[in-house]
């Protein structure tokens, strides 16, 4: 029996970000991750070709890593404050947020193999 795909990347608004990722307004000088699992956040635009190519890959990864990693998407045109906060100048930009430690940013539509390696090495490694 084939496993049914049911997980996909979750779109975040500023309000969602403040409850699921970080309350940056309350703690502007300190990163305090609020998530229950490590996260990968895709900063994208609807008009961006590479972003459109990356979207189904992120949905596949959301399914493969369900319960281990949360995969989020932030539309930079709708959430300009979040884009500015993270200094997003090009899309797609991917923010890897481990449970402990400093988030790491990557640019471009990375191949699925590279994304899986980053998830394993940055998000799921045991400190």
Predicted regions and their residues:
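N-terminal targeting signals for export/organelle localization
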Residues: 1-18, 124-127
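A short beta-strand-turn-helix
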Residues: 13-39
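Acidic phosphotransfer microenvironment of two-component signaling modules
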Residues: 15-18, 80-81, 113
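Short pre-active-site segment immediately N-terminal to redox-active cysteine/selenocysteine motifs
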Residues: 36-39, 43-47, 90
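A short glycine-leucine-enriched loop at secondary-structure breakpoints
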Residues: 85-89
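Non-catalytic, surface beta->alpha helical segment in thiol-disulfide oxidoreductase systems
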Residues: 90, 95-127
């Amino acid at each position: 029996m084939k496993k049914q795909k049911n997980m996909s990347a979750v779109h975040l608004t500023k309000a969602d970000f403040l409850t699921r990722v970080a309350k940056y307004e309350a703690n502007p000088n300190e990163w305090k991750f609020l998530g229950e699992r490590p996260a990968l956040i895709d900063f994208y635009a609807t008009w961006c070709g590479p972003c459109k190519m990356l979207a189904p890959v992120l949905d596949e990864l959301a399914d493969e890593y369900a319960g281990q990693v949360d995969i989020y998407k932030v539309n930079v045109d709708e959430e300009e404050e979040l884009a500015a906060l993270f200094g997003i100048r090009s899309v797609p930009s991917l923010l890897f947020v481990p449970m402990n430690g400093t988030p790491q940013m990557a640019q471009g539509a990375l191949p699925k193999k590279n994304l899986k390696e980053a998830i394993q090495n940055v998000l799921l490694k045991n400190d």
